[in-house]
């Protein structure tokens, strides 16, 4: 059963009445039990022990908030002071009915100000407890604060603490360490007042193998027992007659006869049939219970952590037991990589050249962090992204606005005095994500580091300052798109690359390319080079000093969770490389590789993108972070570019991943094989005709293989849709999961891969087929509704065709806007003569319809349908509230199968006689009259509201349910009842009264009932 809040309030309040506010607990359990079953007679089967246990659970697990508990205490205290008859009599063991009724009708009657004061009191109490509990504790050892549902209550609690409590603890003399401590205690106080549990023991959160619940163990044990008994009887019937088996079979038959209320079995075949039926019952029950548990687990996980839910889908699809590396090998490999303080070559000639070249740059002034900087940075942070080792989420810094000005002040002081940086500031937790199925190799992991949120806020402010300096002085080259704001990233590079490859292929021009892959690029760049880069590009002195200091303090702990194994290493000092997971890291890393772009561009040895003699551009390379592709018109020139890249990489101590480096040589449309030998003797092999290279996510050779890539993407998309439909998500969550997990597989290819309308229509058709296969979409329901928003009566599935058209249009506009400032983009725009799906050379292409136009057109088309259009026509009438009509689609969490069935009813595609005869043209149906009343045609409208045979049964039951809802709402509003129960379980009492209100229940005909309901609603 489910304990409602009203029940919990009654138990807690009655307990206080009986014990006189816990001053006399003598024999209270029997009195509490009697009072409870008197108030809730339908729960008379609950034992005295169970009621006493529930009282303890209410207090221990805070089933009633602290505010509610204090409120009930005040009410009981006032009641005891004003009415002595509430005292428990000495010669009786139970409360009398008047006392029970007095408390049962006692409801909260505090005003808004009193409620606010109680909230503030509770917050202050929890805040003081947190200050006492966590004072003088290591910030890295404090317990984790769980994520909270973003509710009005949470915002109210946060605002109250921010306005009334924090100002008493934060002032101009507060240090950064103290500020961090106060924010943590504030987060703990708000979380606890919001009902969250904060475990003191951090070991409690280690990954444990999920054991089956008790009900599952009981059912499995019972099924195993039945199968064992069934097997023994089967063997006995087949002729096995050992003495042991005979005794066992006799015991089984005796047990079956003793536990039956029906006619006893007379032979062994009947006993076997009985066991077979029991086995079927229990196995089906186990299946149902597991589905229910999966449904609850899937939807809860989807609500709180979509990313983790999608990751579990990927893990479940592989069904492969992955073996992690040993803790020693994991620690050893990454320690060897990070703890070696390797220096770059400061005497390299190109460093002198780069230093001389950048003399034109205006030096960056010393930076001060302002409150505006803090607000702008924090507003762009995700509320509940994984926190660092200090366990404070972004939400608390965002909503504790009183701290922003003091945070800016402390950050400015920190930039000017880096030695004041707290020790925990630079400690990270690095989560190791496997790159492939070779999980035993510690090098096959991608390290993602979670740093303290307060550190990331500071580095985000610094990043904005540095990026503005780079923009003002035009420092970053346009060939690098890894950290460029407002760029299109990988897709922009792929479009430029596609134009180059297709122009070369169609015109049979010479093109020589090389793919360069760095081995552990982020993890191997020397700190000495990162420091010198800041000096070369004239970053402000205080930022440079601060970054130099914190680099010397970087350390992290590796965490690897695989299957049921969790590995945690000792802290590792970071003396080489840069964190992956910090907003400053991409920009800093791109600055470290920026001189290479200058060295390559000054050679003028690239490939010439031509439109005509006036519009052309020589391109030598494209960069996306550390993914480098070189272009040249001859093999000799390409070798020169490779030599420059090799020299630069060697000087900054970054190594090539030789296995992933390739060259390709096309002369007059024909392939040639020329390997490139590095100075160390290693070879970069040339690609042969059948070999492809995965560049930024797409396999390519002389060009992108559109057909094979499309087939791969379609297969992956449909596989993700299938994996989603196999889960137990609710209808709304199922559609959202398809839009956010499956559709992006295709979205990334829009603008790069040639998709025709036929391709996209077939994908949508396959999607609808899968929905139909899983009973989520009726095969004859309106397909238009699938792609309409839920607020308009649809289901919210993304229309892939419109999404494709919109992305193509947006990319075209982006390139056209860049032509004024970029010669590269201007040349690519003129050169793209249907080489890519954008067809940038053709400017007279109509844009797709806007979102509003698309919705309006679809609704009009839906209305014009002769059968499907009846429902929207009814909803569009003035007497119908269309918003309320469609609310259930947006707010109710119902099964996707139920949702699809309800929409099929609205679309009137249920197999009624009228539908079979007039829509299906079924010649076997000669009479379409109702099979119950035989008075008129059997349509959906007739079945749900006009059949005389259903009037006194189904219709009356439906109207009674409506009356129950109204009855309960009125009773709750006027404090006649305290417990809200589901309407289908609610049984109205004949008469309920208080001192000022009463409500009665009677049985009337349908017409009179409707009149009474109208009168109640009018009042």
Walk through the language-model features, giving the residues of each.
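Short, conserved micro-motifs composed of acidic
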Residues: 550, 561, 655-691
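Active-site metal-binding core of divalent-cation-utilizing nuclease and nuclease-like domains
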Residues: 920, 976-1019
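Surface polyanion/phosphate-binding segment centered on an Asp-His-Pro turn
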Residues: 101-239, 246-247, 687, 702, ...
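Eukaryotic helical DNA- and histone-tail-recognition domains of regulatory proteins
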Residues: 1-36, 62
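Surface-exposed loop/turn segments and immediately adjacent short secondary-structure elements
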Residues: 108-125, 129-136, 228, 235-443, ...
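Extended C-terminal regions of large enzymes
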Residues: 271, 278, 282, 739, ...
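Basic, alpha-helical interaction scaffolds
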Residues: 681-757, 775, 810-823
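Conserved pre-catalytic core of RNA-dependent polymerases
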Residues: 359-595, 599, 897, 934-954, ...
């Amino acid at each position: 059963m489910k304990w409602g809040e009203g029940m919990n309030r009654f138990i807690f309040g009655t307990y206080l009445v009986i014990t006189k506010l816990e001053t006399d607990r003598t024999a209270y359990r029997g009195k509490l039990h009697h009072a409870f079953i008197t108030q809730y007679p339908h729960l008379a089967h609950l034992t005295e022990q169970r009621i006493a246990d529930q009282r303890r659970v209410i207090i221990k697990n805070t089933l009633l908030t602290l505010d509610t508990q204090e409120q009930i205490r005040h009410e009981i205290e006032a009641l005891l002071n004003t009415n002595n008859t509430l005292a428990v009599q000495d010669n009786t063991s139970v409360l009398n009915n008047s006392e029970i009724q007095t408390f049962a009708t006692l409801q909260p009657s505090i005003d808004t100000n009193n409620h606010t004061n109680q909230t503030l009191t509770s917050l202050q109490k929890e805040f003081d407890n947190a200050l006492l509990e966590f004072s003088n504790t290591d910030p890295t050892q404090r317990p984790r604060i769980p994520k909270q549902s973003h509710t009005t209550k949470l915002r109210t609690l946060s605002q109250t603490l921010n306005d009334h409590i924090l100002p008493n603890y934060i002032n101009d003399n507060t240090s950064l360490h103290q500020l961090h401590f106060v924010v943590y205690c504030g987060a703990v106080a708000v979380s606890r007042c919001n009902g969250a549990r904060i475990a003191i023991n951090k070991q409690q959160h280690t990954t444990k193998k999920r054991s089956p619940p008790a009900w599952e163990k009981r059912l499995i044990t019972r099924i195993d027992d039945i199968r064992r008994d069934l097997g023994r009887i089967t063997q006995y019937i087949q002729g096995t007659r050992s003495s042991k088996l005979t005794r066992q079979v006799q015991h089984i038959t005796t047990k079956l006869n003793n536990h039956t209320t029906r006619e006893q079995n007379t032979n062994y075949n009947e006993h076997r049939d009985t066991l077979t039926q029991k086995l079927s019952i229990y196995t089906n029950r186990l299946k149902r219970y597991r589905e229910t548990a999966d449904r609850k687990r899937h939807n809860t996980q989807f609500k709180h952590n979509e990313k983790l839910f999608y990751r579990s889908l990927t893990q479940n699809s592989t069904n492969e037991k992955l073996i992690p590396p040993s803790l020693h090998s994991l620690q050893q490999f990454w320690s060897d990589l990070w703890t070696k303080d390797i220096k770059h070559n400061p005497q390299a000639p190109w460093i002198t050249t780069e230093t001389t070249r950048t003399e034109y740059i205006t030096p960056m002034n010393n930076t001060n962090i302002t409150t505006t900087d803090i607000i702008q940075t924090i507003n762009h942070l995700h509320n509940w992204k994984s926190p660092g080792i200090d366990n404070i989420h972004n939400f608390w810094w965002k909503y504790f606005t009183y701290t922003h000005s003091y945070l800016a002040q402390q950050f400015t002081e920190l930039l000017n005095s880096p030695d004041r940086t707290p020790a925990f500031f630079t400690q990270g937790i690095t989560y190791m994500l496997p790159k492939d199925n070779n999980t035993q190799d510690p090098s096959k992991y991608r390290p993602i580091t979670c740093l303290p949120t307060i550190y990331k806020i500071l580095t985000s402010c610094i990043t904005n300052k540095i990026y503005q300096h780079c923009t003002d002085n035009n420092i970053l080259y346009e060939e690098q798109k890894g950290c460029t704001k407002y760029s299109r990233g990988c897709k922009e590079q792929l479009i430029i690359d596609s134009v180059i490859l297709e122009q070369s292929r169609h015109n049979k021009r010479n093109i020589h390319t090389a793919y360069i892959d760095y081995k552990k690029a982020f993890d191997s760049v020397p700190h000495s080079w990162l420091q010198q880069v800041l000096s070369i590009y004239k970053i402000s002195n205080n930022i440079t000093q601060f970054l130099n200091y914190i680099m010397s303090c970087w350390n992290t702990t590796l965490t690897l969770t695989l299957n049921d194994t969790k590995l945690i290493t000792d802290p590792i000092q970071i003396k080489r490389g840069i964190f992956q997971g910090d907003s400053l890291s991409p920009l800093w890393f791109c600055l470290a590789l920026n001189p290479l772009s200058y060295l390559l561009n000054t050679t003028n040895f690239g490939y010439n993108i031509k439109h005509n003699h006036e519009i052309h551009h020589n391109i030598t390379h494209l960069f996306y972070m550390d993914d480098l592709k070189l272009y040249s018109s001859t093999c000799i020139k390409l070798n020169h570019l490779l030599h420059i890249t090799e020299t630069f990489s060697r000087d900054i101590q970054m190594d090539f991943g030789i296995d992933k480096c390739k060259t390709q040589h096309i002369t007059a449309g024909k392939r040639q094989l020329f390997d490139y030998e590095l100075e160390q003797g290693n070879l970069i092999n040339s690609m042969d005709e059948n070999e492809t290279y995965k560049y930024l996510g797409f396999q390519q050779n002389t060009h992108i293989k559109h057909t094979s890539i499309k087939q791969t993407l379609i297969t992956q998309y449909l596989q993700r849709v299938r994996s989603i439909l196999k889960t137990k998500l609710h209808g709304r969550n199922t559609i959202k999961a398809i839009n956010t997990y499956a559709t992006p597989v295709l979205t990334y290819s829009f603008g790069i891969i040639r998709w025709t309308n036929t391709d996209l229509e077939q994908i949508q058709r396959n999607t609808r087929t899968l929905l139909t296969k899983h009973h989520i979409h009726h095969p004859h329901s309106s397909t238009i509704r699938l792609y309409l928003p839920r607020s308009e009566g649809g289901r919210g599935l993304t229309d892939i065709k419109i999404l494709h058209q919109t992305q193509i249009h947006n990319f075209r506009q982006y390139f056209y806007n860049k032509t004024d400032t970029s010669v590269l983009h201007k040349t690519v725009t003129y050169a793209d003569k249907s080489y890519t799906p954008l067809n940038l050379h053709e400017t007279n292409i109509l844009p797709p319809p806007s979102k509003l136009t698309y919705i309006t057109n679809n609704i009009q088309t839906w209305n014009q349908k002769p059968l499907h259009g009846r429902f929207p026509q009814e909803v569009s009438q003035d007497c119908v509230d269309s918003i309320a009509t469609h609310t259930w689609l947006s707010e109710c969490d119902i099964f996707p199968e139920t949702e699809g069935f309800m929409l099929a009813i609205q679309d009137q595609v249920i197999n009624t006689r009228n539908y079979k005869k007039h829509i299906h043209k079924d010649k076997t149906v000669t009479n379409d009259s109702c099979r119950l009343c035989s008075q008129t045609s059997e349509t959906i409208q007739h079945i749900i509201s006009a059949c005389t045979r259903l009037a006194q049964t189904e219709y009356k039951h439906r109207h009674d349910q409506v009356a129950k809802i109204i009855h309960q709402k009125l009773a709750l509003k006027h404090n006649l009842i305290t417990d809200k129960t589901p309407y289908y379980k609610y049984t109205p009492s004949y008469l309920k009264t208080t001192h000022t209100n009463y409500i009665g229940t009677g049985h009337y005909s349908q017409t009179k009932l409707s009149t009474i309901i109208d009168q109640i609603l009018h009042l």
